[in-house]
From Swiss-Prot:
GO terms for biological process: D-ribose metabolic process; pentose-phosphate shunt, non-oxidative branch. Signal peptide: none annotated. SUPFAM superfamilies: D-ribose-5-phosphate isomerase (RpiA), lid domain, NagB/RpiA/CoA transferase-like. Keywords: Isomerase. Pathway: Carbohydrate degradation; pentose phosphate pathway; D-ribose 5-phosphate from D-ribulose 5-phosphate (non-oxidative stage): step 1/1. This is Ribose-5-phosphate isomerase A. It catalyses: aldehydo-D-ribose 5-phosphate = D-ribulose 5-phosphate. Homodimer. It comes from Burkholderia mallei (strain ATCC 23344). Substrate binds at T32, G33, S34, T35, D85, G86, A87, D88, K98, G99, G100, G101, K125. The lineage of its organism: Bacteria, Pseudomonadati, Pseudomonadota, Betaproteobacteria, Burkholderiales. The keyword Isomerase applies.
Amino acid sequence: MTQDELKRLVGEAAARYVTENVPQGAVIGVGTGSTANCFIDALAAVKDRYRGAVSSSVATTERLKSHGIKVFDLNEIESLQVYVDGADEIDGSGAMIKGGGGALTREKIVASVAETFVCIADASKRVAVLGQFPLPVEVVPMARTAIGRRLAALGGVPVLRVKQDGAPYVTDNGNEILDVKGLRIDDPRALEAAINGWPGVVTVGLFAQRGADLCLLGTERGVETLRYAAH
């Protein structure tokens, strides 16, 4: 199967998971990116079971609304049973690198309040050690250079994310992203805490302190369900 076919496979599997495990009338947390889009497309078939969704980005909001799925502000919701999102990498503990789609801050906020985090990914995203995929760090623009120096001191190579026209990529929150290459992340929880503590960092795209509870992993043999210890 192609990577796109695997993404559709896990998107459909996630919709089945939600149908089987989340009661009718609930609100679903939804991530951002191509794999999350496959989940949204599959969720549309059972949308009448649920009140709607909490979105992690402007792009996800637009896709949800295109399917007629009501989108709630997180501030309107008392509880969120499940959050479904993709990952750029996921290790054996359920820690992830996320943020390739630029929505890492809002993704982390929604994930933090969900009772269950369901990661959906194809098998290429499973790794032994995080860090081959560049680590996104969302920064306040005035702190970009200072944060870049600190990331370089860790052994990484920070690169400002830019659009096709060469202008800096701007997040939904009005910030910029440094993509850090060359890091071998042996202790993602500690690195997440350290980088998040730097003035000027909005958030780092490490999801280790609140990692996935389970992963629906698309493989040539079908969908594998991987479960992780509590974070």
